[in-house]
Amino acid sequence: MHFTMEELCASETAKKKGINNKPNAQQMINLVYLCAYVLEPLRLAMKEPIKIGSGFRCEALNKAVGGVSNSQHMKGQAVDLCIDGDMKKGKKWFDYIRKNLPFDQLILEHNSKGSYWVHVSYVYPDFGKNRRQVIENLLKK
């Protein structure tokens, strides 16, 4: 595997604020499934590194970054993938996931500072159903 638990839980905000952003056993299991069914297949297909911008968030970290109260990041079911301002790469990853991989929610997102990322979540079938919800709010051109 190309992904580590450390990178899936890394957070500059958690470091700065002294937040212990450690997942429990169930959250770790969810992260492993997310890697196995979405992140690793994406990495192998794209043949390029996939950088995690935001992965697991404990409740305190989720509040600190302004995450929604029902964020799948808190369950270990979601990550935001960095595309480093490369919308072509972001669109390629987004389209590949949508057409080829299981997912619960897939969003091409941005913030007011001009940062862009791909949000993807996955729910292992034993724990719920994947909705295959797609939100592409950036590339309406």
Predicted segment positions?
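Short connector loops at helix/strand junctions that flank enzyme active sites
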Residues: 45-47, 74-78
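Catalytic cores and adjacent binding grooves of peptidoglycan-active enzymes
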Residues: 70, 75, 83-141
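Generic non-transmembrane alpha-helical segments
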Residues: 37-46, 92, 96-100
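Extracytoplasmic cell-surface/polysaccharide-interacting catalytic and binding patches
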Residues: 1-43, 134-141
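Extended, low-complexity, intrinsically disordered C-terminal regulatory tails
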Residues: 39-65
